[in-house]
A protein has these predicted regions:
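N-terminal pre-Walker A segment at the start of P-loop NTPase domains
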Residues: 1-28, 167-210
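N-terminal accessory targeting/assembly segments
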Residues: 2-61, 218
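N-terminal low-complexity, Ser/Thr/acidic repeat segments characteristic of secreted
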Residues: 7, 35, 182-186, 216, ...
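A cross-family "folded-core" feature that marks the main globular domain of proteins
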Residues: 39-40, 50-51, 58, 66-69, ...
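An accessory alpha-helical subdomain
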Residues: 127-179, 308, 312-357
Length: 361
């Protein structure tokens, strides 16, 4: 594994959620002025290596570089984003297929299919198709475990919500934002990224990204998510209204309706949610225990149910990660067939062309 540097900016741009695979490649495409470079190739054909090479070159030049990791294999990259250039290069193959809307204008297709000896690979058709099918089966089973865990965690969040004083939350956010986010003349804007995901290694949380982009941390400790959900939703609205560019990080388990973290690089400020799934361990944080917004006596009546949900969800996610690890092993075997049929000299030539397109040669 390529070790993440202390100041490395790492995200996911897609993950398996209770609703299936959720990707943020389309929102990335819609970011103002963004030009996308779409890599097309097979497994094990050098896509991630090409992007790692580009990321290293950009970082050596001092460019702000976002590394986008693959949730199915966090050691591999699904993309690299250079915000200063308004450019991104991404793996545009399944499960996050991206096709050009305006080829050459908004998107450039970087095809590596010409590097594959199709005749050689054709000799292994049965083995390759069987591995693709087994990989899909294992990923589908993992998704069902994640869906079951998500159902329990949602039940816990709704249970906590019945004991929450949301008016108190709203008043708190108004005071907090007045103190830490002065109004600006700018127009608010937003990037969508994931800071955590369920992976073959368990739940991976890129806490170092917050450290790279901020030096002030407001951390909401919330075991079940009902209070932090509203806190982050209101903070997002305030930040955009006050004219800031923000990086919004949805919850990997419920990305459609829950935000876990918000980063405001301009203020060097991060709002983070701390819980069992992504514990925050940072020095000098302003810690806010969300129990202050709860009727704890009322919530205590549901303690056994909440504990059961947490234990069961943890076991389900552990099984999901184990299945994802099996899927990764299957994918690794699949890559051996492709690697044997790839001309990596041609891949190196394509990588050099990409470096030139990004002005990094």
């Amino acid at each position: 594994m390529e070790a993440a540097r202390r100041d490395s900016i790492d995200f996911f741009l897609g993950a398996t959620t209770p609703a299936g695979f959720k990707g943020y490649f389309e929102p990335l495409r819609r970011e103002p002025g963004m030009q996308m470079y779409l890599i097309k190739s097979g497994p094990g054909c050098g896509k991630s290596t090409l992007m790692k090479r580009l990321a290293r070159a950009a970082e050596q030049r001092g460019e702000l570089t976002q590394r986008i990791h693959c949730a199915s294999d966090p050691d591999s990259l699904d993309g690299v984003i250079l915000p200063g250039q308004h450019r991104a290069i991404v793996d545009a193959t399944a499960p996050h297929v991206v096709e050009p809307d305006a080829p050459g204008a908004d998107e450039v297709v970087v095809s590596l299919y010409h590097t594959i000896d199709a005749e050689k690979l054709h000799q292994c058709t049965d083995e390759v198709k069987a591995l693709f099918a087994r990989n899909a089966l294992l990923r589908s089973r993992a998704a069902r475990y994640i869906a079951s865990a998500g159902s329990l965690l949602l039940d816990s969040r709704r249970t906590e919500a019945c004991s929450a004083n949301f008016d108190k939350v709203r008043r708190y956010v108004k005071r907090l934002c007045t103190r830490v986010m002065p109004r600006t003349e700018g127009i608010g804007s937003e990037e969508l990224r994931l800071l955590s995901a369920v992976t073959p290694k368990g739940e991976v949380f890129y806490q170092g990204t917050a450290q790279a982009l901020a030096d002030k941390f407001i951390v909401f400790r919330d075991d079940y998510g009902a209070v932090s959900r509203l806190l982050l939703e209101l903070i997002r609205a305030e930040a955009l209204t006050r004219g800031y560019h923000i990086i919004t990080c949805p919850c990997a388990m419920h990305p459609e309706d829950k935000i876990d973290h918000i980063l405001i690089p301009e203020l060097k400020l991060a709002f983070l949610t701390d819980n069992r799934w992504h514990p925050v361990h940072l020095p000098s944080v302003q810690a806010v225990r969300c129990t202050r917004f709860l009727d704890r006596e009322n919530l205590a009546a549901y303690r056994a149910r909440l504990r059961f949900n947490e234990r069961a969800a943890a076991e389900l996610l552990e099984q999901a990660s184990a299945l994802m690890a099996q899927a990764k092993s299957c994918h690794d075997e699949l890559e051996t067939y492709y690697r044997a049929a790839v001309d990596f000299g041609k891949v190196d030539e394509a990588a050099a062309e990409c470096m030139e397109m990004f002005g990094l040669k």
